[in-house]
């Protein structure tokens, strides 16, 4: 058996604004701790305010 690569456990994801749908942030997440889609409150430069950003595939 081979060891899992870090990219398998921590894949790169894109966060998109839920209001204007613009993809503003690129980050990684731990698939074991958060198997469902990530939701974070981040600043959207297009909206000019803090909005909920959801993980896109």
Swiss-Prot record:
InterPro entries per record: Ribosomal_bL33, Ribosomal_bL33_CS, Ribosomal_bL33_sf, Ribosomal_zn-bd
GO function term, MF aspect, one: structural constituent of ribosome
Keywords: Ribonucleoprotein, Ribosomal protein
One example of a Gene Ontology biological process annotation: translation
Superkingdom of this protein's organism: Bacteria
Pfam families: Ribosomal_L33
Presence of the UniProt keyword Disulfide bond in the record: no
Cellular component GO terms held in the UniProt record: cytoplasm; ribonucleoprotein complex; ribosome
Family per record: Belongs to the bacterial ribosomal protein bL33 family.
NCBIfam families on file: PRK00504.1, PRK00595.1, rpmG_bact
Database matches in PANTHER family: 50S RIBOSOMAL PROTEIN L33, CHLOROPLASTIC, LARGE RIBOSOMAL SUBUNIT PROTEIN BL33C
HAMAP family in the record: Ribosomal_bL33
Protein name according to UniProt: Large ribosomal subunit protein bL33
Name of the encoding gene: rpmG
